C-alpha cells in the first residue's frame, strides 16, 4: 500500500481557525477543539444579535419620537401620529422621524400639525 502524505490541508484549516479565535481568551484561543466550539458559539451570537440590533434601534427610534410628541401635547399619542402619517401617505420611516425629532424639533412640530388636519 502506498503511503498517504496529508500535510498542509489540516494545518491550513487549523491556521484559519486560529486566526479567527486569536482574540479569544485563555484556552479558547489555544486548543483546537475549544476553538471550534467557541467559533460556532461566536457565529451563533453574531447571527442572533444582528436581528436584536434591528429591534433595539427600532425601539430607540419609537421612544425618541414618542418623547417629542408628548412634549407637544398630552392628548396626542405615538400611534395616532403614525396612523395619521399613513393616512396622509407621507413616506417617512421611524429612523428619519427620530433624526428629525432629535435635530430639528420645529420641523417635526410642523409635520404633526399638518397631518392632524
Swiss-Prot record:
GO terms for molecular function: mRNA binding; rRNA binding; structural constituent of ribosome. This is Large ribosomal subunit protein bL20c. One of its GO terms (biological process) is translation. It holds the Pfam family Ribosomal_L20. It is found in: Plastid, Chloroplast. Its main location: plastid. GO terms for cellular component: chloroplast; chloroplast envelope; chloroplast stroma; plastid; ribonucleoprotein complex; ribosome. Keywords: Chloroplast, Plastid, Ribonucleoprotein, Ribosomal protein, RNA-binding, rRNA-binding. Gene3D superfamilies: 6.10.160.10, Ribosomal protein L20 (1.10.1900.20). Coiled coil: none annotated. Binds directly to 23S ribosomal RNA and is necessary for the in vitro assembly process of the 50S ribosomal subunit. It is not involved in the protein synthesizing functions of that subunit. Belongs to the bacterial ribosomal protein bL20 family.
Amino acid at each position: 500500500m502506498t503511503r498517504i502524505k496529508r500535510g498542509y490541508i489540516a494545518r491550513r484549516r487549523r491556521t484559519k481557525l486560529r486566526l479567527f479565535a486569536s482574540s479569544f481568551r485563555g484556552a479558547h484561543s489555544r486548543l483546537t477543539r475549544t476553538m471550534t466550539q467557541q467559533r460556532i458559539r461566536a457565529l451563533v451570537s453574531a447571527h442572533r444579535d444582528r436581528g436584536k440590533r434591528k429591534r433595539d434601534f427600532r425601539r430607540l427610534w419609537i421612544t425618541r419620537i414618542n418623547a417629542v410628541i408628548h412634549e407637544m401635547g398630552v392628548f396626542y399619542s405615538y400611534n395616532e401620529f403614525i396612523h395619521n402619517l399613513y393616512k396622509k401617505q407621507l413616506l417617512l420611516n421611524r429612523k428619519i422621524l427620530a433624526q428629525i425629532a432629535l435635530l430639528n424639533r420645529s420641523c417635526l412640530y410642523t409635520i404633526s400639525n399638518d397631518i392632524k388636519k
